[in-house]
Amino acid sequence: MQVYEETKTTAGLTLSDWTKKFWEWLFQLSEEANPVTVVGPSRPWRYGGRQPTQFQKQCMEKHGESVWFIAPAPYSEPNSVIQLYIPVGNWWFLIGPAIACSSQQLYPSLDSIDKVRNHVNEDIGKTNELWTIFDGFSIPWYYIDNTDKFIEIKNVPTKESKNMLHQNLEEGTIQTLQCGYWNFIEPVVPGEHLLTIHSKSSIYRVDITYQLSVSGPAN
């Protein structure tokens, strides 16, 4: 598997910066709207995750380009086909086929930064199958390692949370470490596009196809 280093800046942010924004977006979604939880109905709209966010809109207005997040959806039905409606514009696509994020607040037994770092690295190290195909072509992976220091994510919804009710979260803030394999696709022409994500490890499996309709309106 060949892994590339991405150095391009998109809308004023590096790929590493955008992966941090991805996790912020994911953790700030309610469980019913979050594509990587099993809480709530498995409806197609949830895989869009209430995008575009205010930050994504601001980037588009300021820079003339922005980034759309596509989650791996590890708890979707095997071989699911999900249609996403995306507004016309210079949208890059950030895809996380095999990614990991961990926190002391979510896993109290990880009582040091080294233990949290080992947790995410071990999770990614278990990946034994990985491929992503866009419009019939395999696309490259970029490995991003954001484990040097904790990354704070605020406004995590914890009230009435079925997954986080037992966690020791103060004011909905968590300190995270993140790493994993990402795909980053340049803006595409309006119309229909097909994205297939497959990844497998000893702890999870992702098999999902997204039909991307770049014509709007957004989900």
Segments predicted by a language model, with ranges:
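N-terminal segment immediately downstream of the Sec signal-peptide cleavage site
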Residues: M1-Q58, Y210-A218
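Feature for soluble, non-membrane regions of globular proteins
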Residues: M1-T14, W18, F27, Q54-E61, ...
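Extracellular-facing segments of soluble proteins and assemblies that are Gly/Ser/Thr-biased and enriched
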Residues: E65-N163
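A surface/extracellular/periplasmic glyco- and lipid-processing/surface-interacting theme
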Residues: Q104-Q105, L194-T196
